[in-house]
């Protein structure tokens, strides 16, 4: 489609459609790049944390080794150990007497996991919304363009194939633009959603390991 012609024609609706498409595409690719970098760093850091946790018998020593690692598993391990220490320091409190260590750790670890995962959820709603709405916005632009093309053709009195095919063909590209924006957004959403699920599985496994080791902890 001749976008220059669209902008020169001054039709505010078509201009708005293509500007919106451009913004949605920009947001999509920015989110894809930022989220991919974040997931890559998280996976790399988690691999280091797993290695230290596996090779170190003492949980206290393992947590100290991974403290400097910027990774979700490192944060979970630190917060779980801190929760254990807080419980032991306040065993005489009413909360400690009413809530066994086992249940207390489950609650605290689950809360930590939820807070960590919130950091990896940003942008997913935007990608899903763009993937779902972009084709319809493009279709709206096409319908609008065809409508005005037919009006202009009727007013000019030129009903030849060439006169009809040109303006309508240009209007149809708005739908293609919508698909061009939507397809990367949908693919990115699925890819990032898969990465987030893998991260959640790693957190679940680490949470179970921390829970068992803390229950068998002899000292804090």
Curated annotation (Swiss-Prot):
Cellular localisation:
Cell inner membrane
Pfam families for the chain: MotA_ExbB (PF01618)
* Assigned GO CC terms: plasma membrane
Transmembrane segments annotated in the record for this chain? 13-33, 126-146, 168-188
Q: How does it sit in the bilayer?
A: Multi-pass membrane protein
User: What is an annotated GO biological process for this record, any one?
Assistant: protein import
| Highest taxon, organism lineage | Bacteria
Keywords from the UniProt entry: Cell inner membrane, Cell membrane, Membrane, Protein transport, Transmembrane, Transmembrane helix, Transport
Assembly mode: The accessory proteins ExbB and ExbD seem to form a complex with TonB.
Q: What does this protein do?
A: Involved in the TonB-dependent energy-dependent transport of various receptor-bound substrates. Protects ExbD from proteolytic degradation and functionally stabilizes TonB.
Name the family the entry cites: Belongs to the ExbB/TolQ family.
The protein's name is Biopolymer transport protein ExbB
């Amino acid at each position: 489609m001749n976008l220059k012609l669209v902008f020169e024609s001054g039709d505010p609706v078509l201009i708005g459609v293509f500007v919106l498409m451009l913004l949605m595409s920009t947001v999509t690719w920015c989110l894809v790049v930022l989220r991919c970098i974040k997931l890559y760093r998280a996976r790399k850091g988690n691999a280091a944390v797993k290695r230290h946790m596996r090779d170190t018998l003492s949980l206290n020593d393992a947590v100290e080794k991974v403290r400097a690692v910027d990774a979700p598993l490192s944060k979970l391990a630190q917060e779980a150990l801190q929760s254990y220490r807080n419980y032991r320091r306040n065993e005489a409190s009413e909360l400690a007497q009413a809530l066994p260590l086992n249940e207390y750790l489950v609650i605290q670890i689950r809360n930590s996991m939820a807070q960590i995962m919130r950091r990896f959820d940003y942008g997913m709603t935007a990608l899903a919304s763009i993937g779902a709405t972009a084709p319809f916005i493009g279709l709206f632009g096409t319908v609008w363009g065809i409508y005005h093309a037919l009006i202009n053709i009727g007013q000019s009195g030129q009903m030849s194939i060439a006169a009809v095919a040109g303006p309508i063909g240009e209007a149809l590209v708005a739908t293609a633009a919508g698909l061009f924006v939507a397809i990367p957004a949908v693919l990115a959403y699925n890819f990032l959603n898969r990465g987030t699920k893998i991260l959640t599985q790693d957190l679940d496994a680490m949470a179970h390991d921390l829970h068992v080791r803390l229950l068998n902890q002899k000292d804090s």
